[in-house]
Amino acid sequence: MARLFGTDGIRALANGDLLTPELAMAVARAAAVVFTHGRVAKRRQVLGKRPVAIVARDPRISGDFLVAAISAGLASSGVDVLDAGVIPTPAVAFLVKNANADFGFMISASHNPGYDNGVKIFAHGGVKLPDVVEDRIEYFLDKQKLSPIGSKVGRITRFVDAEDRYQMHLLSTLFTRIDGVKVVIDCANGAASGVSPDVFKSAGAAVKVICADPNGVNINDGVGSAYPERLRAEVIRNSATLGLAFDGDADRCIAVDSNGNTVDGDQIMAILARSMQQRGTLRNKTLVTTIMSNIGLDRAMKKLGINLKRTQVGDRYVIEAMTQGGFNIGGEQSGHIILSDYSTAGDGILAGLHLCAEIIRTGKSLTDLASIMEIVPQVTANIETDDPTTLLNNKKIRHEISRIEKSLKGRVVIRPSGTEPLIRIMVEDLNPEKAERACSHLADFFKQEIQKS
């Protein structure tokens, strides 16, 4: 059986073959076994209380039945459930820590289309799970579950001030107010639709909001961080200082400058890392990112005397490296930005606020700030396959990848997707035409080998 958890929890077609109410309940009951033993059980015995879990979701229509299934699984296992409703993923991470909950569930498929959904789990302290804990949850899926009766079953109650707590936390992180910033916010018809406009207004910004009308099916539908076209047009039309686009669960953020140019996660990390260095808050002179970040980021950080540490793709691997090394900024090109002085997870709204604050602190435009790094052209392609491991171990393919990489003044990165049945190809070279040719050639080579198999 294939591993249930991918790079960011469980993600699949909602109510399809995998992500069913039955699976959601089983995962909840298995998680209850894993998280209510050992230290948790002892801590709760001392307090004389049942274990507590926070459950929340993004606005997808399937979130209703998945939250119901997970809440039922937890309560029937003796866990009290605090239902936080529709809030961003990083809000769940914050609230698990802030409310001293034992663990938390976020029902979201992040940037995926509205027909997908997913399950993300946070441990005590609001941290994402390492592989070993995910494996333990999978192990207990078909094992005997906790079955308390009478007064020992859990209660399900509304976490009434969840959003207010998160908003106050975000505002408390700012090193300056952002009065004078005119920002257009694209909420992707997702979880940021409720909280983000209020936060930016409270921080002092003049706010124009778009794509903040979720109906259960329009999340990420041609909007949000993966589709910045409308945001670009609105920034220019409104003569805004900048635009910010989040994804469906608001753990990603990309920006658009006043000229309509996209400022991606790499550029945002570079801007914020330099800001932290100048303000004396950058720990151990290091920024953590993944193998997919542009080589231009390496060059920019080297000029500043900032080390760049790379991990495999997935913000939880970035977070693990940050924790192990004592670093306090990291992220991904896609817009996951982790500022660990304030958050245990990637937080798009937090990153956007701090980007606005840096504009105020420096008095510079986002265009000027983003010029900190020169982006080396990258070309990407996706290859559909149900068996990425076999393809990536194919000797002919490995030889061809090596041959192509030697011909470039850049890199080739090829990896299986952690969330979809795909192999992702990325080719980087100073010459964009050369990168395009190399990527196209490798994509064709993969397809030929698939046809032969």
Curated annotation (Swiss-Prot):
Molecular-function annotations in GO: magnesium ion binding; phosphoglucosamine mutase activity; phosphomannomutase activity
Function: Catalyzes the conversion of glucosamine-6-phosphate to glucosamine-1-phosphate.
CDD domains: GlmM
Entry's cofactor comment: Binds 1 Mg(2+) ion per subunit.
Residues that bear Phosphoserine: S110
InterPro entries listed in its UniProt record: A-D-PHexomutase_a/b/a-I, A-D-PHexomutase_a/b/a-I/II/III, A-D-PHexomutase_a/b/a-II, A-D-PHexomutase_a/b/a-III, A-D-PHexomutase_C, A-D-PHexomutase_C_sf, A-D-PHexomutase_CS, Alpha-D-phosphohexomutase_SF
Protein name (Swiss-Prot/TrEMBL): Phosphoglucosamine mutase
GO cellular component: cytosol
Cofactor(s) needed by this chain: Mg(2+)
Active site: S110
Enzyme Commission (EC) number: 5.4.2.10
Residues annotated to bind Mg(2+): S110, D247, D249, D251
Modifications the protein undergoes after translation, according to the UniProt entry: Activated by phosphorylation.
Gene: glmM
Name of one Pfam family that matches: PGM_PMM_III
Catalytic reactions on record: alpha-D-glucosamine 1-phosphate = D-glucosamine 6-phosphate
Protein family per UniProt: Belongs to the phosphohexose mutase family.
One of the GO BP terms on file: UDP-N-acetylglucosamine biosynthetic process
Source species, domain of life: Bacteria
Key words of the record: Isomerase, Magnesium, Metal-binding, Phosphoprotein
